[in-house]
Design a protein with these regions (language model features):
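Short, ordered loop/turn segments at secondary-structure junctions
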Residues: 9, 67, 109-112, 223-224
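RNA substrate-binding interface of SAM-dependent RNA methyltransferases
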Residues: 71-168
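Short, hinge-like loop/turn segments at secondary-structure boundaries
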Residues: 122-126, 186, 237-238
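Active-site/ligand-binding-proximal alpha/beta "capping" segment
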Residues: 164-202, 207, 216-219
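Structured adenosyl-cofactor binding patch, chiefly the S-adenosyl-L-methionine
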Residues: 205-248
Length: 248
């Protein structure tokens, strides 16, 4: 079943009005016709099962057949602070993070990051990355589109993490798996979690010291050295399992 997103104001009186680029996609790419069915989310935990009623110039008007509460979201807010990786790895990271239930992705510029974005390039990248997030949210049946936020410096990212309930930083020199396990098991539904992942080459000692001074807890991901595009997915997978097993 095809899945689309609308604002809450586009759901009214038993109808859904789909607008924007999705109109062309539904009409000319998917070649859907009146009478065909699709699912719509409005950013809440509700899924609307709809039937296309008619096409207007800039809208697809759908009739709501039924609705149900969705349990697709992890019962916590998870923020991935990702050091800027090389090439197009960020696209893969965003896609998989959204599939695994992340709330938002915050790119970071760190001391060992090779990639440096000026304002123009950053604007273009953020737009593209949010498009990838939307596509991944549709594919995975999310009820909202996780945002890819503007790039932060490492110190800005540390400050951004401060209000979160749990702040974690996987670090290759952290070897205490028992402590990591204990920390992860303290995370409860309804809480917020920040995960800080370095680029290729990881974090330098000053960044690690800064993180520890601000209450960000080091954890280990095991005895193997993981690529930057693997590390965040490993933590997200563990959190998905731990949090969903307590609510399913």
């Amino acid at each position: 079943m095809y899945h689309f997103f609308v604002d809450r104001g586009q759901v009214n009186a038993g109808k859904v009005w789909i607008e924007g680029s999705d109109v062309n996609h539904i009409r000319n790419v998917l070649r859907m016709r009146p009478g065909e069915k699709l699912d719509v989310s409005d950013g809440s935990n509700t899924i609307y099962h709809c039937e296309i009623d008619r096409f207007e110039e800039c809208q697809v008007v759908c009739e709501i057949l039924s609705s149900e509460e969705s349990y697709a979201e992890i019962p916590a807010q998870i923020y991935l602070f990702q050091g800027l990786p090389k090439a197009d790895k960020m696209e893969l990271i965003i896609q998989k993070a959204v599939e695994l239930g992340v709330t938002a992705v915050i790119p970071m510029s760190t001391s060992r990051a090779v990639v440096k974005l000026d304002a123009k390039k950053e604007e273009s990248k953020i737009k593209r990355w949010n498009g990838i997030s939307e596509s991944a949210a549709k594919q995975s049946g999310r009820t909202f589109i996780p945002q890819v936020e503007p790039v932060l410096s490492f110190k800005q990212a540390v400050e951004r993490m401060q209000p979160l309930t749990h702040k974690l930083i996987p670090y290759e020199l952290c070897e205490n798996m028992d402590e990591t396990r204990r920390l992860l098991y303290t995370i409860k539904p309804g809480e917020s979690i920040g995960i800080m992942i370095g680029p290729e080459g990881g974090f330098d000692k000053d960044e690690i010291s800064c993180a520890l001074e601000h209450g960000i807890m080091p954890i280990t991901l095991g005895r193997r050295i993981l690529r930057t595009e693997t590390a965040g997915m490993s933590v997200l997978s563990v959190l998905m399992f731990l949090l969903e097993q307590r609510t399913c």
